[in-house]
Amino acid sequence: MQVPEIEKQIGITLYSTDTDGLGGQLRQEVEDFIVKEITNREEGQEGKYLILELIKRDWDTHHLTRTLAKILQVSQKRISVAGTKDKRALTTQKISIFDIDAQKIEKIHLKDVELKVLGRSRKSVELGDLWGNNFRITIRNITHSSEEIHKLLEKTTNEILAQNGVPNFFGIQRFGSVRPVTHLVGKAIVEGDFEKAALLYIAEPFPDEPEDTRKARQFVKETLDFKEGLKIYPLHLGHERAMMNHLIANPDDFAGAFLVLPKNLYRMFVHGYQSYIYNIILCRRIEKGLSLNEAVEGDVVCFKNEHGLPDSSKTEKATTETVNAMNRLIKKKRAFITAPLPGHNTEFASGIPGEVEQAVLDELKVPLQGFNIEETPEMSSKGTRRELLLQVEPKFEVAEDELNPGKLKAVLEFMLPKGSYATTVLREYMKVDPLQMS
């Protein structure tokens, strides 16, 4: 089954299910994508941190925390969340605000934002608090008959359940939905070419961008005239504009230009390149006929933490003596086979899985020591491992599509652990271009 070209660009070359795609469209309205955070936190009534439940509709998480900080007249650093949620979605999550009076929250009136005080804590809301997310997602505008829709949903679900889940790919959001450039920038950084990296991010045009944006990028790409570029770059391209301002003041300091960006953004470039390599290794492993749910000698296996989630810091290599015991743990969901997100100090598999990993690194000419980035140590990565299989048990229902008269909609519900992508599950059902899912 043919995979969309844009997915091939991010290292995804296959589907794990053989059933024909449902087609359809996601996010026709915001409520079609509902996300509820699952955490292990229980709040009390004491502590410096005010803990709130945040329900937001069609808000970017970072934009919202910036807005809240402005209203409350506090530093944005005092507001923390356990995870960034989708923008075009209805999402529920916990946030914490340091040293703020609960009464001040009552004065916040933002469209499509609801804040409810849950209590206080001595500890801020952090990434470690997040277990996962519950999703309820509506696929609309499906052209098949009711009988065909039920059949396709049932067959795909049965395939997913039979293989205990889907490949744990990094989804298109990791790379940029309209402009999948993150991993290309990261590759140039790891290769030590900061000029190429900066120009890719600032000036590489993509066909699905608005025309004025494409033209502005093309101008800077051809002329390297950042002063003129600032005059024509749309104001919403704030990160690119900040980098150009730095380069006007500090010509040729391409490495330094990245450090004017928010830390979570500039770290995403190297992570994006690692994610691209991981996606390719995962596909090659499947093409080689290696299981994602049964270890072979040489596999690096990680174990579950106290919450039952994969812990990539606890790994062990399967040997002739241990592989059967490890597979018993894998069947009980207490252990998980992994693939590398390579860095300058990564543990690689041996045996046949190791050959797959090494072949991809050789083919891509990945300079592992390049992940130790002297110019910008903040971007360096020693690497880690990530579980190959995204264990998921989707449930579905079919109903009349009230937004598209005469058609039906499918509603999927499932839970995913943190760090995984709902679109990785949805792509197996829909089998469409990722832009129809964004």
From Swiss-Prot:
Transmembrane parts of this sequence: none
Cited InterPro entries: PsdUridine_synth_cat_dom_sf (IPR020103), PsdUridine_synth_TruD (IPR001656), PsdUridine_synth_TruD_CS (IPR020119), PsdUridine_synth_TruD_insert (IPR011760), TruD_catalytic (IPR042214)
Disulfides per UniProt: none
Biological process, per Gene Ontology: tRNA pseudouridine synthesis
Active site: 86 (nucleophile)
Alphabetized Gene3D superfamilies for the sequence: 1.10.1510.30, 3.30.70.3160, TruD, catalytic domain
Family matches, as PROSITE patterns: TRUD, UPF0024
Substrates-to-products reaction catalysed: uridine(13) in tRNA = pseudouridine(13) in tRNA
Molecular function GO labels: RNA binding; tRNA pseudouridine(13) synthase activity
Enzyme Commission (EC) number: 5.4.99.27
Alphabetic keyword roster: Isomerase, tRNA processing
TRUD domain: residues covered: 165-390
Broad class of enzyme this protein falls into: isomerase
Family listed: Belongs to the pseudouridine synthase TruD family.
Function comment: Could be responsible for synthesis of pseudouridine from uracil-13 in transfer RNAs.
The protein's name: Probable tRNA pseudouridine synthase D
The organism's taxonomic lineage, starting at the top: Archaea, Methanobacteriati, Methanobacteriota, Stenosarchaea group, Methanomicrobia
Designated gene of the protein: truD
